[in-house]
Amino acid sequence: MRRSAVVLILALVVTALDGAVPGTAIGDHGGREITSLFTCDRPVSPPRCTSVGDGRTHHVAFDASLTAGLADSLRQAMEEAYDRPTKLTMVEQSRVTRKTDAVAFSDDYGENGAAGWVYCPVDAPQGVNPSGDRWCRQQEIHFNINPRYGVFFADDGSRDHVTCHELGHTLGLRHWGNPPQTDDGGVGATCMNANTPDGPTRLHQFDIDHINGYEYRRVPVPARSNGAPVPPRVLPWRGVVATTEVEPLPTTLGEMVNAADAVVLGHISLVVPGRVFGTRHDNPLHYASATLEVESVLAGALPWAHRSTLTLEIPLFDGPSSIADLPVWGESVFLLRNKGTSATEVGLPPERVRAESAYYRMLTFTGLVVNDDGTALTADDAGPLARLSGRSFEAAVSVILNAGR
């Protein structure tokens, strides 16, 4: 499988057909309609992007890296959660062909904050259908079997849930709200609930109705579909869209600040190639090591060795060459999780804990506030942090500082 995806973290650069732009659904209620979501134009953490299929027959290739347990669960999800209750026909494949809609992999991708994600490589066959949604073949489903995420793969029920969930993203199904309420106020039982290990293993009737009511258009595959260039994002951590994250987005700023191991004011001074994870297939995941110069600690604490500089790891889902596309942020507030904390929580050996303690990641994929010429800038879907966007950066820092007290 190719790794020239400009990352979908959505990585996908959409091929513009007749100037159409993929539609975006909004709202946090349950039972969201089928849609593609976000262009996938930057290597972020991790690439995640929802696309729709281009027909009612959905071909899924099982890569040799897929564990036996995940293969069994994915096979069951295809049959019991999708083929039987919907108008879709699910087809298992042992290799990738021109008909392949999704390819499933599993590997230890490192502690990047997500147990699974879906993305569409930029060089995969793709386009925009008459409904304005991006369709994509050969989408990649990645299950991260790093020990930190063992709870998502610990038993048949957990694997059944996560495979049903990620498969739904390849068809355009989106996360339900948190809690996953239906329009009548009830709680929906669906595998499309976000961040719920060992959650439901089937679709809600809303999901089934949306699949059955959507026109998955069969459109010609362009001879070449590199996509049109998209302007770089100021914030690469955009939306938590098609990932199964381990750290749920807190509902209040105080909860978010207190959940971080450290909240620091600082800037990225250097980005260099870092560690490499993944040996089960031929697409290893490279990381960038970003040097974060710490100006002050706003909340939490840092060990003595990291009080002036620390290493922030950034996954390079578009391959090692995409390190050149990463921004070197100016002054910003970073909400951080030390990877040693995660290693300790899952009971890794002391020597592994010590090794992982040298690295940090973002608490959530939107845990960043940038000083944009004196104004605070956040991702639109940064939860409590988004309320700081547009204020003076100085005022935003003060609010964060007070929230941690």
Tell me the role of every PLM-derived stretch.
Residues 222-240, 283, 317-405:
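Netrin-like (NTR/C345C) domain of secreted extracellular proteins
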Residues 278-314:
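OB-fold (S1/OB) nucleic-acid-binding surfaces
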Residues 71-182:
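Metzincin-family zinc-dependent endopeptidase catalytic domain
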Residues 241-259:
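Short boundary/loop segments of OB/S1/cold-shock single-stranded nucleic-acid-binding domains
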Residues 28, 139-141, 148, 158, ...:
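Metalloprotease/metallohydrolase-associated module, dominated by Zn2+-dependent proteases
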Residues 266-268:
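Conserved hydrophobic positions within beta-strands
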Residues 17-69, 220:
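Disordered inhibitory propeptide/activation segment of secreted metzincin zinc metalloprotease zymogens
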Residues 1-27, 228:
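Secretory targeting and sorting signals
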